[in-house]
Design a protein with these regions (language model features):
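Noncatalytic nucleic-acid binding interfaces
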Residues: 448
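Left-handed beta-helix
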Residues: 2-3, 203-405, 410-429, 436, ...
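Catalytic metal- and UDP-sugar-binding loop of GT-A-like glycosyltransferases, i.e.
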Residues: 9, 112, 406, 451
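Conserved core of the sugar-phosphate nucleotidyltransferase
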Residues: 120-243, 261
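A short, conserved beta-strand element in the Rossmann-like catalytic core
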Residues: 117-118, 428
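A residue-level structural signature of the nucleotidyltransferase/glycosyltransferase Rossmann-like core
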Residues: 109, 190, 197-198, 270, ...
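Conserved N-terminal catalytic core of the sugar/cofactor nucleotidyltransferase
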Residues: 1-8, 15-19, 23, 31-113, ...
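Residue-level signal for inorganic ion chemistry
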Residues: 29, 39, 96, 115, ...
Length: 477
């Protein structure tokens, strides 16, 4: 069996699992079920002797989160492709296919989202082996999930004949149904949930684009050929990329192709499309209550109660069918049956221009992360975490001075011409306008508290003189 290259799609806005999932830090990077994040689990289940190193397709904002989370689980990516902007799944999958085809014209790809869970990894890998067999014959293979209940939130796959595990020809894609039709399809054995997972030879999906979407093939090919290597990331060319159609792989290719097969499988799959799904997939007590470490439930039934901040204790009393998720800057309380309306709430917050709609409390950067602890008109306090060996840019500020207090590790601090080491419980003052840099010279993470004073504290008040991450003026961090 030839090694298969995993293609992991890592985009999305994450609004359905707000406030824990947001545009700046969507659900795939969050440990919603277990200790690993959804992205880490997605990468882990596509490892082993039958798989090559994964190719990740993501955007510029997530690139360092991707590398950090892969490092945490010891997985080396074969490549990380950076989309200049989101154009849905068709251009993303095509870019990865062309990238792999240039390396190996016989490449076989398995394409998977980064934000799903699959509990039975062995069953999933057996399904991949079944798909591999028919992909060698030129089939484009999709994976169908055996429904466990009538579901209106998923698209469906109609089979040409009933099958339990063997690949069979696909008869039709079915749009998300109403409840009446969902019940009918659940009772039939000919319909499966559309998982959004695919397996095919790179040459076959490229040929499909050549036949059904040649303009996208031309644009993505140019974008890849005109890409640049940016700190090891393959940054696709924007000018060519925006010429692609913003369209899913289902609409662009799959619904038009005549060489489609489906492999059915049951492996504890969920796309975690709402807080009700998160509740279902986590272990609950005898009353159906799932709580985090900082949450207490008294006389509650069928409820999810989570605190995502060590300083916030959440107590639920007499709750039934309720979702409660508390974070430092936002709290969600919702009826379990209305979990899909969370997205509407996020839209309202956006209209109100509330930063909580899209911005995660922790702001991730190539060197680590920071979070704002408090902010006022004349000051802001941040907690800053710097990875071992990492450094911030050499920079200055026009509107603020800074005071750094190291609370863990050692900081190498440059202020104008002076370089000094600041140890735990020591501090240093950065005058307004001073050219400065912070670096972690140690082998362990370094953390400090930063107190800013001045008249403006925006992340665009940064003038860079030197930056190892090649960020321009006004770029964040």
């Amino acid at each position: 069996m030839q090694q298969i290259t995993p293609i992991i799609l890592c985009g999305g806005s994450g609004s359905r699992l707000w406030p824990l999932s947001r545009k700046s830090y969507p659900k795939q990077f969050v440990p919603l079920v277990g200790n690993k994040t959804l992205f880490q689990n997605s990468a882990t289940r596509l490892t082993g002797k039958q798989f090559k190193n994964p190719v990740i397709v993501t955007n510029s904002d997530y690139r360092f989160i991707v590398t950090e989370q892969l490092q945490e689980i010891g997985i080396d990516p074969g490549a990380i492709l950076i989309e200049p902007e989101g154009r849905n799944t068709a251009p993303a999958i095509l870019a990865a296919a062309l990238f792999e085809y240039q390396i190996n014209p016989d490449a076989i790809l398995v394409v998977a989202p980064s934000d799903h869970i699959i509990k039975d990894v062995d069953a999933f890998q057996l399904a991949i082996e079944e798909a591999y067999k028919v992909a060698l014959d030129g089939q484009l293979v999709t994976f169908g999930i055996k429904p466990t209940h009538p579901e209106t939130g998923f698209g469906y796959l109609e089979l040409s004949k009933i099958s339990t595990a063997q690949a069979v020809p696909l008869k039709a894609f079915v749009e998300k149904p109403n409840l009446t039709n969902a019940k009918k399809m659940f009772q039939s054995e000919n319909f499966l949930w559309n998982s959004g997972i695919f397996l095919f030879q790179a040459r076959d999906i490229i040929e499909a684009f050549k036949k059904y979407s040649p303009s996208d093939l031309d644009a993505v090919n140019l974008s890849l050929n005109n890409s640049i290597n940016d700190l090891g990331f393959c940054r696709l060319n924007l000018t060519d990329w925006v010429k692609t159609e913003n369209i899913s792989i289902d609409y662009a290719i799959m619904e038009k192709s005549d060489n489609l097969s489906v492999v059915p499988f049951s492996a504890g799959w969920s796309d975690l499309g709402g807080w009700d799904a998160v509740w279902r997939e986590n272990v609950s007590n005898a009353n159906g209550v799932n709580t985090s470490n900082n949450a207490t439930a008294i006389g509650c039934e069928n409820s999810l109660i989570r605190s995502e901040d060590d300083s916030i204790e959440v107590v639920g009393i007499g709750l039934k069918n309720i979702i409660t998720v508390a974070m430092k800057d936002a709290v969600l309380v919702a009826d379990m049956s209305k979990s899909q309306d969370v997205k509407k709430a996020v839209d309202i917050l956006k209209e109100k221009k509330a930063s909580q709609a899209t911005q995660f409390p922790k702001d991730h950067r190539p060197w680590g992360w920071f979070e704002s602890l408090t902010i006022d008109e004349k000051f802001q306090v941040k907690k800053i975490h710097v990875h071992p060996g990492a450094s911030l840019s050499l920079q200055s500020h026009k509107y603020r001075a800074e005071h750094w207090i190291v609370v863990s590790g050692v900081a190498e601090v440059t202020i104008d011409e002076e370089v000094k080491l600041i140890s735990e419980n020591q501090s240093v003052y950065i005058p307004l306008g001073a050219i400065h840099r912070m670096r972690n010279p140690g082998e362990n993470p370094m953390e400090l508290i930063e107190v800013q004073t001045g008249t403006y504290f925006g992340e665009d008040d940064i003038f860079r003189y030197d930056d190892v991450y090649s960020r321009g003026q006004g770029a964040k961090g």
